[in-house]
From Swiss-Prot:
The complex is composed of two ATP-binding proteins (GsiA), two transmembrane proteins (GsiC and GsiD) and a solute-binding protein (GsiB). This is Glutathione-binding protein GsiB. Part of the ABC transporter complex GsiABCD involved in glutathione import. Binds glutathione. It comes from Escherichia coli O1:K1 / APEC. The gene is gsiB. Keywords: Periplasm, Signal, Transport. Residues 1-26 form the signal peptide. It holds the Pfam family SBP_bac_5. It comes from the Bacteria.
Length: 512
């Protein structure tokens, strides 16, 4: 009898030990619920922040930005700039390999920048690199980049999420299909991409930073509906969700297993007006529409208070941003201006949105109602990523159907040029970049160009202020709000957060 008891005890002990072992070695798998789908996994060919954020799973750049949007070294150790501002010499880290075993070195950097700066490749981010005259591999750990003209923000271009180092062997193997076959130096490598449902990445065993990554896998799952994203957190289907529906923030905050975070943002939301098309070619119409929108009410209705009314065309936290007296809500003034412009009974137009998630839908509905109060009938359309790429980003001025366009912008380089030039410079009309107002002003162009030729902060301040003064006066936009970034995560997930440009930082992420 004693022997039987002993045997049973051993069996029980064995089962308990097995269970403990399975718990101890349980895979650390994280699901991240995000607000829209991905367009490509090639950072050089992605126009949206989300696709580039997910690409950080595989890819790294020479430099990056920290949570305060300050420059940091990543694959580079240091850099120097020539006195004439034309030559950047970058020293690289040694001993790093791509996920396919290829060495990371100066030749790899050259291959990437040569590809990015070649207009024949028709990459969507070409404009970031068009000022590169040549890239030279001086030795395995030294790269020399020569510019066509001085560009004082160039090091920030190298820190942009688009400037990722892709394996040159993979570039040669996959060519234009590299967006489906990412191979970088990052902490994770591609496991599965179901293009309608999710991207799953797995730990890269050969990652160069000791002890990282700590997670075994991350699944990036697009969930357009705000309420569904929040519900996935509460049921444990997801461990991180962004953006969080503002109206549910208070509810999630009460959940003892979930941590809610509201973090600073450089995400500006606005409506551009196509100034090459009637009636938006009339400055009085554009002024009227700015008076027609009650921004403080919009903050409450669509953002549940997690935003601030815009006071300029550049978010205040970006260097050289200018703030102005906010547009007051004055529908009477709006109707007067419309009458003066020749539209006493208003007009009909279209209002498109770059996203189709629930918050965007609320902004569209609110704006539609506000415009109706001053006689403007707006037919609204909320686009998915594919529609946006085809109908907005892919068409030039003559064929574009854009009239009013609700979207957002975050200057992911952390500096003023990328907050202004892509959106207001004459040469940056779609399909080149994102000047969806098709705005053009020679003085603005000149001020922006001059600001890139000087390293003097006082002169930069003067030039960027002059450009913003003109833009604010001519009103090609209806500036709406600067968002606060509301995310939530399971309390056992650490080291995973939202960057001010709405990208993600997760290199230290862990499940406790």
């Amino acid at each position: 009898m004693a022997r039987a008891v002993h045997r049973s005890g051993l069996v029980a002990l064995g089962i308990a030990t097995a269970l403990m072992a399975s718990c101890a070695f349980a895979a650390k798998e994280v699901v991240v619920a995000v607000g829209s789908n991905f367009t490509t996994l090639d950072p050089y060919d992605a126009n949206d922040t989300l696709s580039q954020a997910v690409a950080k799973s595989f890819y790294q750049g020479l430099f990056g930005l920290d949570k305060e949007m300050k420059l940091k070294n990543v694959l580079a150790e240091s850099y120097t700039v020539s006195d004439d501002g034309l030559t950047y010499t970058v020293k690289l880290r040694e001993g790093i390999k791509f996920q396919d075993g290829t060495d990371f070195n100066a030749a790899a950097v050259k291959a990437n920048l040569d590809r990015a700066s070649d207009p024949a490749n028709h990459l969507k981010r070409y404009n970031l690199y068009k000022n590169i005259a040549k890239t030279e591999a001086i030795d395995p750990t030294t790269v020399k980049i020569t510019l066509k003209q001085p560009f004082s923000a160039f090091i920030n271009i190298l820190a942009h999420p688009a400037t990722a180092m892709i394996s040159p062997a993979a570039l040669e193997k996959y060519g234009k299909e590299i967006g489906f076959h990412p191979v970088g130096t990052g902490p994770y490598e591609l496991d599965t991409w179901n293009q309608t449902d999710f991207v799953k990445v797995k730990k890269f065993a050969g990652y160069w930073q000791p002890g990282l990554p700590k997670l075994d896998s991350i699944t990036w799952r697009p969930v357009a509906d705000n309420n569904t994203r929040a519900a996935m957190l509460q049921t444990g289907e997801a461990q991180f969700a962004f953006p969080i529906p503002y109206e549910q923030a208070a509810l999630l905050e009460k959940n003892k297993n979930i941590e809610l975070m509201a973090s600073p943002s450089i995400m500006q939301r606005y409506i551009s007006m196509n100034v090459t098309q009637k009636p938006f070619d009339n400055p009085k119409v554009r002024e009227a529409l700015n008076y027609a929108i009650n921004r403080p009410a919009l903050v409450k209705v669509a953002f549940a208070g997690y935003a601030t009314p815009a006071t300029g065309v550049v978010p205040p936290s970006i260097a050289y941003a200018q703030s102005y007296k906010p547009w007051p809500y004055d529908p009477v003034k709006a109707r007067e201006l419309l009458k003066e412009a020749g539209y006493p009974n208003g007009f009909s137009t279209t209002l498109w949105s770059s996203h189709n998630h629930s918050t965007a839908q609320k902004v569209l509905q609110f704006t539609q109602q506000q415009l109706a109060q001053v006689g403007i009938k707006a037919q609204v359309t909320a686009m998915d990523a594919g529609q946006r790429a085809a109908e907005v980003e892919g068409k030039g001025q003559k064929e574009s159907g854009v009239r009013m366009f609700y979207t957002g912008w975050s200057a992911s380089t952390g500096e003023a040029d990328w907050a202004l030039s892509p959106l207001f410079a004459s040469q940056n009309w779609p399909p080149t970049l994102f000047n969806t107002a098709f705005y053009s002003n020679k003085q603005v162009d000149d001020f922006l160009a001059q600001a890139l030729k000087t390293n003097d902060p006082a002169e930069k301040t003067r030039l960027y202020k002059a450009a913003q003064d003109i833009i604010w006066q001519e009103s090609p936009w209806i500036p709406l709000v600067v968002e606060k970034l509301v995310s939530a995560h399971s309390k056992n997930l650490t080291g995973f957060w939202i960057m001010p440009d709405t990208g993600f930082s997760f290199e230290d992420a862990d499940l406790q």
